Amino acid sequence: MYWIYNVLLIFYWIGLIPVILYRLAFEDGFYERIKQSAGYMPASLLKKIEGRRAIWIHAASVGEIVATSPLVKEVKKEFPEAVVVVSVVTATGHAMAHRIIPEAEGIIFFPLDLPYLTRKILHIIKPITILLVETEIWPNFLRIAQSEDIPVMMVNGRISDRSMKRYKYISAFTKEMLRSIERFCMQSKFDAAHIEVLGAHTPDITVTGNMKYDQTY
């Protein structure tokens, strides 16, 4: 299944080349965004992570970033010596992260989910663990993290009815991806039941509530 996914992904990005070129020409900040997504990290971040343990937290957009803020605070309390790197997908999420997560040493754009780029960035950041906020399931990222023996946890996990139907279309692939995640901390019993049906091991699932309610900014 992974080779099919990768072929489709390559064609997808080839199709987006005209859009990318247009945005590079006319959209402020897009060059830095695509540069980071291609594996080129800011020099300031490279200095901060050199020789230190890193915890990577991925939160796609604004909603996930709101939930990530209290999580980062707790991580810094428990592991004050660790570098916290927060990755996002959207420009609005990036701006929000800078505004409400000052504790993070690095805020970056998530890499394109291509095997070479994913492996490259994992080797640069060298995270001791990865926390995925809500339902950020990226096949190559999970597979390569597992191959590098990097533990991955889903936090504030949520599986809507709509997502459930979508994942069921690729049930075998979904199950394989979920087996790359060691722990599932879900928002509700409803979400826990959904993730279990999709293939997560029951002993690895915990209901922890919604972290967005812990936000104090």
Residues covered by each model-derived region:
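Active-site and donor-binding regions of nucleotide-sugar-utilizing enzymes
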Residues: 17-217
